[in-house]
A protein has these predicted regions:
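Active-site proximal loop and beta-alpha junction motif in alpha/beta enzyme cores
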Residues: 1-144, 148-182
Length: 182
């Protein structure tokens, strides 16, 4: 086993890896502290109309879109739909609300969208599509996104310290997370 200490814009991230021969088989990452920042923020989304989002931090600020009246599940929409809507929704949220990390004033805007849905993989607890940048959907469940999602679920009493959480991506890849401490 080995350990890497990564100095990221969000803070120190520790990566512990298990190597077998010349290949790394498993990596465990201890992320920066994550937290639910805001609940129930409303915004107009193209095509869908008004939606409500929670905003959580897991290394970046995420607008998390859970099932609701105008949005049932990410499976109902194409990746192209999410790529088209996400920058508009993100911009509108940044114009309407303020986002500021309590310990790092340089982190002061919502940068990612996390669209949720029911898992399709038998081992997964939840599924997501993470939009970032100008027009990209992450193929992985996203480490900072998984941390933000877990912080949201923990704050709402759906995960507690020590609970495991398996997050599925838009292409069914999996990340395993655990609430380490409150």
């Amino acid at each position: 086993p080995g350990t890497l200490r990564l100095d990221t814009p969000a803070g120190l991230v520790i990566a512990e890896y298990k190597q077998v021969g010349e290949h790394v088989e498993e990596v465990r990452i201890t992320n920066v502290p994550s937290f639910l920042y805001a609940e129930g923020l409303t915004v107009e989304c193209p095509v869908l109309g008004e939606i409500s989002v929670d905003v959580a931090y897991g290394g970046n600020f995420y607008a998390i879109v859970d099932p609701q009246k105008n949005y049932r599940d990410m499976a109902d929409h194409s990746a192209n739909d999410l790529v088209a809507w996400s920058p508009v929704v993100r911009q509108r949220l940044n114009e309407k609300y303020s986002f500021a990390h309590p310990e790092n004033p340089g982190i002061n805007r919502l940068s990612h969208m996390l669209w949720t849905g029911a898992p399709t993989h038998p081992e997964a607890d939840a599924r997501n599509a993470v939009f970032y940048g100008d027009k990209a959907i992450d193929r992985s469940p996203c480490g900072t996104g998984t941390s933000a999602r877990m912080a949201q679920l923990h704050a709402k009493g759906k995960l507690k310290e020590g609970d495991n959480f398996v997050h599925e991506s838009i292409i069914s890849s999996l990340f395993k997370g655990r609430v380490e401490k409150e």
